[in-house]
Amino acid sequence: RDVNKPSVLLFIDNIFRFVQAGSEVSALLGRMPSAVGYQPTLGTEMGSLQERITSTKEGSITSIQAVYVPADDPTDPAPATTFAHLDATTVLPRGLAAKGIYPAVDPLDSTSTMLQPWIVGEEHHETAQGVKQTLQRYKELQDIIAILGLDESSEEDRLTVARARKIERFLSQPFFVAEVFTGSPGKYVSLPETIKGFQMILPGXLDN
């Protein structure tokens, strides 16, 4: 970027290896470990690396990083320190993959600083928030349903569950990247079509 002045696409697989290497070097140097055994300089080292991956007037660097989450705990110091430097995160939980939903992306835990009304537009932003609210309510209801059953839920909660399940299936349309898992050929769905689909599911236009 600084010498040849190109725009660079950088893949890091896996950023957790950088943390592990720092931890091992720190142990060899005899430094006192901090939380969960990580090096005391974890925040400084991660900041130094991530801040070099930035856009300047000379060129830009777009970085895509795979982040291993130990014990599926996002509060672990290694992933937590990494996430603090990222503009967007895509969370791939085992639970969704086990349900056969591909690509197994969790819309609730995934984040993006670009999902703002002045960037994506009011319509897109409002629809995304509506989808997340429905999925969040569904998540809250799952424990109750597991104990009492869906039939004991209120009519409103049953509708929420039905719509949330439609949303989950809608998010698992036959994508090209999922062909190997689903056996279904991939299909391209434009963003306006996707937003329109959610706008039909959320108010109940497809309940029947």
UniProtKB/Swiss-Prot annotation:
Q: Where is the signal peptide?
A: none
Keyword Transmembrane helix among record annotations? no
Give the EC class as a word: translocase
Subcellular location(s) of the protein: Plastid, Chloroplast thylakoid membrane
| PROSITE patterns given in the database record | ATPASE_ALPHA_BETA
Q: Which domain of life is it from?
A: Eukaryota
**Gene Ontology biological process terms, A to Z:** proton motive force-driven mitochondrial ATP synthesis
Cite the GO molecular-function annotations of the record: ATP binding; proton-transporting ATP synthase activity, rotational mechanism
What is the first-listed, main subcellular location in coarse terms? plastid
UniProt keyword Calcium present: no
Q: Which UniProt keywords apply?
A: ATP synthesis, ATP-binding, CF(1), Chloroplast, Hydrogen ion transport, Ion transport, Membrane, Nucleotide-binding, Plastid, Thylakoid, Translocase, Transport
CDD domains hit by this protein: ATP-synt_F1_beta_C
| A single GO cellular-component term on record | proton-transporting ATP synthase complex
Catalyzes what?
Answer: ATP + H2O + 4 H(+)(in) = ADP + phosphate + 5 H(+)(out)
One family from Pfam that matches here is ATP-synt_ab
* Annotated EC: 7.1.2.2
Kindly give the membrane topology term recorded for this protein.
Peripheral membrane protein
Binding partners and assembly: F-type ATPases have 2 components, CF(1) - the catalytic core - and CF(0) - the membrane proton channel. CF(1) has five subunits: alpha(3), beta(3), gamma(1), delta(1), epsilon(1). CF(0) has four main subunits: a(1), b(1), b'(1) and c(9-12).
Cited function: Produces ATP from ADP in the presence of a proton gradient across the membrane. The catalytic sites are hosted primarily by the beta subunits.
Q: Report the sequence similarity comment from the record.
A: Belongs to the ATPase alpha/beta chains family.
Question: What's the name of the protein?
Answer: ATP synthase subunit beta, chloroplastic
Protein source organism: Lonchitis hirsuta
Gene transcribed to yield this protein: atpB
